[in-house]
């Protein structure tokens, strides 16, 4: 694991920073993500120089900042969310009229405040999870009802659906001034710490009853965890790694590639695929900034978002198996295999049991207040019912990589 963290495409962090000192971090990161296979430092420098020269060959009409929370060229090769691909494609598509400075590693904003920094105009684009963004922009909670999405394919199907425009995107823009562009899709489970290293592999929700688990900022995720007797406790990120290592908490709710990219794998012993609500690392932008662009540039933003959505769909599905190791059996040399993280895939019967414990479909009362609140904010849409229906329009056995891409901003 150490080698994977300290090098990207075979180049050390120190050498990457040296190259970035000459050509800028954005050009260097774009060169890294655009490369195939391993690079020498000299090859990276040449690629970064070529990228820099291309990006600055003409004066940009608009220069925008993307606040990418903790993301960088290294971890975006683990969780394939498409943020750098979007920035590079938008620059190329507009022939340099739009230039994006990618600012990651929490240098300008973090998971909890990137959306606010976008609303305030500190950054123009941002990348963060919808769940962490919900604290500032609560309409994001529309995605977080328990078992609303049965699988990853259903998530992609919804985000490609033109109906996502009226249910998610338009109300978010109207209420919070954020234009939702594209997202990666996984489902959240429980990531058990080292306390569970020598215990039997989890096969039932009953084995998790009474455990204490770190919860993110999601308010709806907390409801689901309480109903499943998973005792959600808010723990600062800094304390989560130590809590999982020392056994102060049993686990943490998040998705598999987050464990891998955020360096949680050394302190996680079992990744329990509970699939109890959505996990989305997404890219959004200020709606004011979007509206300030002329028509062709607006079209370019949407087409680049579409390309990034398609790219993330294919690349993250491959990375879950080939990079993360979220499979059974696991491939060797994956992050989970290297760190002895066992994957606990529950049976359909066990997932149904968990769903019946906490889903609004079977246990509506704890969710009624949020459903009414979101209905009011959306202008009268029962968002849970609508998304639940759309998520089941495709066959249950559809593979995520086989979901048909659609340009969601156009009418069906």
Where is each model-derived feature located?
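N-terminal secretory/targeting leader peptides
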Residues: 2-155, 180-412
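Short, solvent-exposed loop/beta-turn-alpha elements that line the ligand-binding surface or hinge
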Residues: 152-175, 201, 206-207
